Amino acid sequence: MNWFTRVRNSLGFGPKRTTDKDLWVKCPSCAEMLFAQEYEENAQVCPRCDHHGRISADERLRQLLDEGYEVLPQPEVAEDPLKFRDSKKYTDRLKQARAKNPHADAFTVGSGAIDGHHAVVGVQDFGFMGGSMGMAVGTAFCAGAERALRRKCGYIVVTAAGGARMQEGILSLMQMPKATVMTRRLREAGLPYIVVLTDPTTGGVTASYAMLGDVHIAEPGALIGFAGQRVIQDTIREQLPDGFQRAEYLHKHGMVDRVVHRHQLKHELATLLGYLQPAEAA
């Protein structure tokens, strides 16, 4: 027995302390270590650099809607009609995503009020397969629009998606015109359709309902575009401006109406509903 072993054995060690792994979070922008409770109480906005973190659909609904709102059930759709498989079965990917998420797919609809103004809010959750748009997302989007038409109130959609869901092929792309038809019905009914663009909003979602709103609001720093910057540069063989797909650049060039901090978003939406919503609904 050497001296180190003797000393170690003579020391009295208390029980091993356990630490909650969720006690701290690291800001993806400034890399600052943040106390998780402080971060959550600040609407998951970094108090150091003001980076807006990605949040779940449930948290978004809690932030935007008054107490007592209703979460609509997820419409039933055919699962995996193409029997798709890449490195694993599509059905297995869905099971994995659902094991980490309380909802059946990436689009959740809440019906309630925003500072007293009746509203239906649809939220895409990037945490569920990158928020990708498939049949379930398209059907849920339309169900939210139908609820707004019945209630004669505004429809607010918060986007966060990597694009169409490749595992559903053409059936995924069919959701683009389907959602577009619903936005037209809202317009014909004189009901406001407001889009909140969050990080990231790309691909087929950007090419359809994300850019068809009466008003487009973006969160600070949100990535918004169709194709990625590298793909565009390789196609046009030109260097693109810094931040050309970020919310602030798009606002400066007229693609976005407002860039609104998450802390002010609920008030901003309530103000817009007061202006745009029919008197009986407002």
Swiss-Prot record:
Name of protein: Acetyl-coenzyme A carboxylase carboxyl transferase subunit beta
Pfam family, one: Zn_ribbon_ACC
GO biological process entries: fatty acid biosynthetic process; malonyl-CoA biosynthetic process
Naturally occurring in which organism (per UniProt): Erythrobacter litoralis (strain HTCC2594)
Enzyme class: transferase
Zinc finger (C4-type) stretch: 27-49
GO molecular function: acetyl-CoA carboxylase activity; ATP binding; carboxyl- or carbamoyltransferase activity; zinc ion binding
Keyword entries, A-Z: ATP-binding, Cytoplasm, Fatty acid biosynthesis, Fatty acid metabolism, Lipid biosynthesis, Lipid metabolism, Metal-binding, Nucleotide-binding, Transferase, Zinc, Zinc-finger
Keyword Glycosyltransferase listed: no
GO cellular component: acetate CoA-transferase complex
Chain sites annotated for binding Zn(2+): 27, 30, 46, 49
Pathway: Lipid metabolism; malonyl-CoA biosynthesis; malonyl-CoA from acetyl-CoA: step 1/1
Subcellular location: Cytoplasm
Domain CoA carboxyltransferase N-terminal: 23-282
PROSITE patterns: COA_CT_NTER
Cofactor binding summary note: Binds 1 zinc ion per subunit.
Gene3D superfamilies per record: 2-enoyl-CoA Hydratase, Chain A, domain 1 (3.90.226.10)
InterPro entries given in the database record: AcCoA_carboxyl_beta, Acetyl_CoA_COase_Trfase_b_su, ClpP/crotonase-like_dom_sf, COA_CT_N, Znf-ACC
Subunit structure: Acetyl-CoA carboxylase is a heterohexamer composed of biotin carboxyl carrier protein (AccB), biotin carboxylase (AccC) and two subunits each of ACCase subunit alpha (AccA) and ACCase subunit beta (AccD).
Catalytic activity as recorded in UniProt: N(6)-carboxybiotinyl-L-lysyl-[protein] + acetyl-CoA = N(6)-biotinyl-L-lysyl-[protein] + malonyl-CoA
Organism domain of life: Bacteria
Role summary: Component of the acetyl coenzyme A carboxylase (ACC) complex. Biotin carboxylase (BC) catalyzes the carboxylation of biotin on its carrier protein (BCCP) and then the CO(2) group is transferred by the transcarboxylase to acetyl-CoA to form malonyl-CoA.
Similarity section: Belongs to the AccD/PCCB family.
Documented EC number(s): 2.1.3.15
